[in-house]
């Protein structure tokens, strides 16, 4: 589903949305995406795949996950490099919630494992990137998502036309920003939209 290609902004509403951010509208009927901000990693005629970037996984942090996956022994949990301690664990979406996906800056690349998306953002789903982060050799910026959001062919386009989503250009602050809870309103402000102005009648940007 994930095509190895990069599309640059700006895009028209009929174009594929790789590298764009989806902002859930009040008309979104799926409660799992209430106030969700989704980074689109791949979008084609075959469907779409994205990562929710503003829903923290409250049951586990990055260090504990590294121990669970045997990336580091429990005795090394408190000795992680400072950058590793900053990596947030997110609920990336309702599909394959037991699988991890790392969105990260483009200063780190694994051959045959890293997918460049757009504007210096990459996706890697490999234990090797977790080992690199734990060893202080990982990317400058990263978040780890458990699961992803997926759409069947034409499904995302239909949801956008039904005013389920706004879409806007993504930037590192929306993906890697420290305040996860503030990302949704920040994305709206980047579009010039006040959260209180949203209604079920709004269209896509």
UniProtKB/Swiss-Prot annotation:
Q: Name one Pfam family in it.
A: DUF179
PANTHER family xref list: UNCHARACTERIZED PROTEIN YQGE, UPF0301 PROTEIN YQGE
Organism, by scientific name, is Azorhizobium caulinodans (strain ATCC 43989 / DSM 5975 / JCM 20966 / LMG 6465 / NBRC 14845 / NCIMB 13405 / ORS 571)
Would you name any one GO CC term? cytosol
InterPro entries xrefs: AlgH-like (IPR003774)
According to UniProt, the name of this protein is UPF0301 protein AZC_0488
Q: Which family does it belong to?
A: Belongs to the UPF0301 (AlgH) family.
Highest taxon of the lineage: Bacteria
């Amino acid at each position: 589903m994930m095509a190895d290609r990069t599309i640059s902004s700006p895009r028209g509403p009929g174009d594929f949305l790789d590298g764009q951010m989806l902002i859930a509208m009040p008309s979104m009927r799926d409660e799992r995406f209430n106030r969700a901000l989704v980074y689109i990693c791949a979008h084609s005629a075959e469907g779409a795949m994205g990562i929710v970037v503003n829903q923290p996984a409250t049951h586990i942090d990055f260090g504990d996950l590294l121990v669970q996956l045997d990336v580091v022994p429990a005795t090394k949990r408190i000795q992680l490099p400072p950058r590793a301690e900053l990596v947030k664990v997110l609920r990336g979406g309702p599909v394959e919630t037991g699988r991890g996906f790392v969105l990260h800056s483009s200063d780190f690349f694994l051959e045959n494992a890293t997918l460049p998306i757009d504007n210096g953002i990459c996706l890697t789903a490999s234990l090797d990137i977790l080992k690199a982060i734990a060893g202080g050799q990982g990317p400058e910026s990263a978040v780890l998502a458990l699961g992803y959001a997926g759409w069947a062919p034409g499904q995302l386009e239909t949801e956008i036309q039904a005013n389920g989503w706004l879409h806007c250009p993504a930037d590192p602050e929306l993906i890697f920003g420290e305040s996860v809870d503030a990302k949704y309103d920040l994305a709206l402000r980047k579009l010039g939209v006040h959260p209180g102005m949203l209604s079920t009648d709004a269209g896509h940007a």
